[in-house]
Design a protein with these regions (language model features):
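Absolute protein N-terminus
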Residues: 1, 22-24
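Short, exposed beta-strand-loop hairpins at the edges of beta-sheets
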Residues: 92-121
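Short, surface-exposed, charge-dense and proline/glycine-enriched linear segments
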Residues: 73-78, 116-122
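N-terminal signal peptide c-region/cleavage motif recognized by signal peptidases
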Residues: 17-20
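Short beta-strand-to-coil "C-cap" segments at the C-terminal boundary of structured domains/repeats
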Residues: 123-127
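Central antiparallel beta-sheet cores of small beta-barrel/beta-sandwich binding domains
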Residues: 25-99
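Bacterial N-terminal signal peptides that target proteins for export
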Residues: 1-10
Length: 127
């Protein structure tokens, strides 16, 4: 009986630990970005140690091609319930960096960039 109890506790502990370290729902996802309603680029989001980054992997803009491979989202962290904060997003064409909050809802990622008293919102679609 003691062996059964120890085995059960060990399995439960391993299961709980693996759930705690499960990847974020944004990890390894690809998103179509939009600017003023028009498709602009494609960003791949990855997670490492609880921190999300987003890299530009494609663009519809001829002048934006030079920015492919650029990390535009840095330091974003999950707050729970599909909400994210603490990161930054950079517009590589304007060379401006904004504080970032985001909200994941199904196949939509609503982002809001803040620069001083100003803010700008975009909704990206999961590819």
């Amino acid at each position: 009986m003691k062996l059964f109890a120890k085995t059960t506790l060990a399995i439960a502990g391993i299961s709980m630990a693996s759930m705690a370290f499960a990847a974020d729902p944004l990890h390894n996802t690809t998103w179509q970005t939009f600017d003023e309603g028009k498709p602009k680029g494609v960003v791949k989001i990855t997670e490492s140690n609880g921190v999300l980054t987003g890299t530009l992997v494609d663009t519809n803009s001829a002048k934006g091609k030079k920015h492919i491979g650029t990390t535009i989202i840095k330091g974003l962290k999950a707050d729970g319930g599909g909400k994210y904060s603490g990161g930054t997003i950079t517009d590589p064409e304007k060379n401006k960096t904004y504080k970032l909050t985001a909200n994941l809802s199904g196949s939509n990622l609503a982002l809001k960039g803040h620069l001083g008293p100003f803010s700008r919102s975009q909704t990206w679609k999961k590819k």
